C-alpha cells in the first residue's frame, strides 16, 4: 500500500477539506481519467482496491497512473483505552481529494474498456466520480 517513506512530522491535525481543486484537475499523462465530484479523504487501502479493480478489468492492457498519494496521517487510539495520555499512533494514511481532482488516468485501451474499468474502480471509492476524456482526443 502507498505511504510516505519519510515525513517531517509524524502526526497532524485533521483539518477540513473544502472547495475545488486548482492543482491536479487536468489529465496529464493518459487519455482517460477518473475525476472526483466530492471532497473526501481517501485511504491508501481504497486507492489500492481501485487500482487492482482497474488493472484486472483491462487484463494487462494499457497503463494506469495513480494521481493521488496518501500523505496525511490518520491517528487512532487503541480500543478500550481511557481518554488522555496523548494522541494515538498513526493508524493509516489518507489522500485529500477535492472536487475536480483527477484521481486515476489510463491509456492504451479502447474507450469502452477504459470507461468500464474506471466505473469498476469508482465503486471502490467513497466519492462520486465521473469519467473524462482528454480534450485533444475528442
Swiss-Prot record:
Keywords: Ribonucleoprotein, Ribosomal protein, RNA-binding, rRNA-binding, tRNA-binding
SUPFAM superfamilies noted in UniProt: Ribosomal protein L16p/L10e
Chain residue ranges for the region called Disordered: 1-20
Single GO BP term: translation
Leader peptide range in chain numbering: none
Biased composition (Basic residues): 1-15
Residues spanning the membrane: none
Short name of one Pfam family: Ribosomal_L16
MF GO annotations: rRNA binding; structural constituent of ribosome; tRNA binding
GO annotation, cellular component aspect: cytosolic large ribosomal subunit
Role according to the record: Binds 23S rRNA and is also seen to make contacts with the A and possibly P site tRNAs.
Family: Belongs to the universal ribosomal protein uL16 family.
NCBIfam families: rplP_bact
Quaternary structure and interacting proteins, as annotated: Part of the 50S ribosomal subunit.
Record's protein name: Large ribosomal subunit protein uL16
Natural source organism: Borrelia hermsii (strain HS1 / DAH)
Amino acid at each position: 500500500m502507498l505511504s510516505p517513506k519519510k515525513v517531517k512530522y509524524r502526526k497532524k491535525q485533521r483539518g477540513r477539506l473544502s472547495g475545488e481543486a486548482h492543482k491536479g484537475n487536468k489529465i496529464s499523462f493518459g487519455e482517460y481519467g477518473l475525476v472526483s465530484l466530492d471532497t473526501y479523504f481517501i485511504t491508501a487501502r481504497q486507492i489500492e482496491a481501485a487500482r487492482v479493480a482497474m488493472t484486472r478489468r483491462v487484463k494487462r492492457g494499457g497503463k494506469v497512473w495513480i494521481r493521488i498519494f496518501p500523505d496525511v496521517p490518520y491517528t487512532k487510539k487503541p480500543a478500550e483505552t481511557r481518554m488522555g495520555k496523548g494522541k494515538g499512533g498513526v493508524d493509516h494514511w489518507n489522500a485529500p481529494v477535492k472536487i475536480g481532482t483527477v484521481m486515476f488516468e489510463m491509456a492504451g485501451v479502447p474507450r469502452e474498456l477504459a470507461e468500464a474499468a474506471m466505473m469498476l474502480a469508482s465503486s471502490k471509492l467513497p466519492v462520486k466520480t465521473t469519467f473524462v476524456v482528454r480534450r485533444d482526443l475528442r
